[in-house]
From Swiss-Prot:
Family membership noted in the UniProt record: Belongs to the RbfA family.
Region (Disordered): 110-131
InterPro entries to which the protein is assigned, alphabetical: KH_dom-like_a/b, RbfA, RbfA_dom_sf, Ribosome-bd_factorA_CS
Name by which UniProt lists this protein: Ribosome-binding factor A
Binding partners and assembly: Monomer. Binds 30S ribosomal subunits, but not 50S ribosomal subunits or 70S ribosomes.
Length: 131
């Protein structure tokens, strides 16, 4: 199978699963969930659905459990909306890349603040008006 077809299918599944989660899944334990990506196996029979979940760690775990309980329903809805010989088995995975990116941004900001403080100290120590 061509890589281009697989990429298009992954994007289409991402859109459809996002729509199902927003409009069809009524479980209150599934909080604010965003589908960040879908990774299909080569034979299109397995899909890892990466999700980002807003909230505290405990709420994220509850949402992930709610998604796991709703997997059968989501898969059946997916089968109604996409024409494939086999609807892929779905596994939800928590996408930690957003949290990792936030952590890196915080570290970079701290480094920049440290550099700004050093620059200000250098300017104060090298004030030409003191001569």
């Amino acid at each position: 199978m061509s890589g281009m077809r697989k990429e298009k299918l992954q994007e289409e599944l991402k859109k459809i699963i996002s729509d199902i989660l927003q409009r069809e899944v009524k479980d209150p334990s599934v909080g604010f969930v965003t589908v960040t990506s879908v990774d299909l196996s080569g034979d299109l029979r397995h899909a890892k659905v990466f999700v980002s979940i807003l909230g505290e760690k405990e709420n994220q775990q509850d949402s992930l459990r709610g998604l796991e309980k709703a997997t059968g329903f989501i898969r059946s809805e997916l089968g109604k909306r996409v024409r494939l010989r086999h609807v892929p088995e779905i596994v939800f995975k928590f996408d930690e890349s957003i949290e990792h990116g936030d952590h890196i941004n915080k570290l970079l900001k701290q480094m920049n603040l440290g550099e700004d403080n050093e620059d200000n100290e250098d300017k104060e120590n090298n004030d030409p008006g003191e001569e």
